[in-house]
Design a protein with these regions (language model features):
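Short linear motifs embedded in intrinsically disordered, proline/glycine-rich low-complexity segments
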Residues: 1-245
Length: 245
């Protein structure tokens, strides 16, 4: 299809034109996201960010190009959350569209998962990092979650704990917006943003989803079983599977 044949998509009602208006939109989006994250716990002052933007090396592009993650501390757990997937998009005509990919993603784990204090070097940060890049690469994960209630992924983590990888040396995650400890959405001046929580799966749980005739139903049943388990929707490596193939 030539450029002349690509249908024109009209800007949304919240779109703005020009660099200054776009900068204000970005500042408003960041302020709304920061306020939401602060409502979840104590936010570390420093963000986690790569020295070189992955999009410069062939990785997926985030809406405002900036890629970062926040660490949010609770009394008994730590949340690692993406910080930028819901930034405004800018097109070649300096038109800024708010809310980016319409989502942010996070993982919550017990304090014991970070006993050495190296959050940026942890397998849980690797999980959130890879999930964030998958979301940016796909572009419409919000539509999948709205349609099916949840999605699952198999990720190639660099150094996961023993016993988490399946026969393909991948680690499964369940992704949805129903975690009882994290709100499903947060508000911005331009509309809501979906907050997706990833829960790491045991290999048997990932296999159960893959073998189910109704995978959406299997994911929903797994989400309910996880929520009712002692660890809830926290990502815990050494727990028993709550559902089997």
């Amino acid at each position: 299809m030539s450029e002349e044949e690509i249908p024109h998509v009209a800007p949304s009602e919240h779109a703005v034109v020009g660099k200054e208006a776009g900068a204000r939109m970005l500042a408003n989006a960041c302020a709304a996201r920061d306020a939401f994250y602060a409502s979840l716990g104590a936010i570390d002052g420093d963000v986690l960010a790569p020295l070189v933007n992955p999009s410069f090396m062939g990785g997926p592009r985030w809406p405002s190009l900036r890629q970062a993650w926040r660490v949010i501390r609770r009394p008994d757990s730590i949340i690692i959350a993406s910080d930028g997937l819901s930034d405004p998009f800018e097109d070649d005509d300096d038109i800024f569209e708010p809310r980016g990919y319409l989502v942010e993603v996070c993982v919550e784990a017990p304090l014991s998962s970070f006993e050495n204090g190296d959050i940026a070097g942890s397998w849980l940060f690797d999980l959130v990092y890879q999930l964030s890049q998958n979301v940016a690469d796909h572009g419409s994960i919000d539509l999948l979650v709205e349609r099916y209630g949840s999605v699952s992924m198999a990720l190639d983590l660099q150094a996961p704990p023993d016993g988490l990888e399946d026969e393909n040396e991948q680690v499964g995650v369940l992704i949805d917006s129903t975690a009882p400890t994290i709100p499903a959405f947060f508000d911005t001046p331009y509309g809501p943003v979906m907050m997706l929580t990833a829960t790491v799966l045991q290999p048997a749980e990932l296999a159960a989803i893959g073998e189910a005739e109704n995978r959406a139903g299997a994911r929903a049943a797994l989400a309910r079983a996880l929520a009712a388990s002692p660890t809830g929707r926290l990502s815990v490596a050494d727990r028993p599977a709550v559902i089997l193939p």
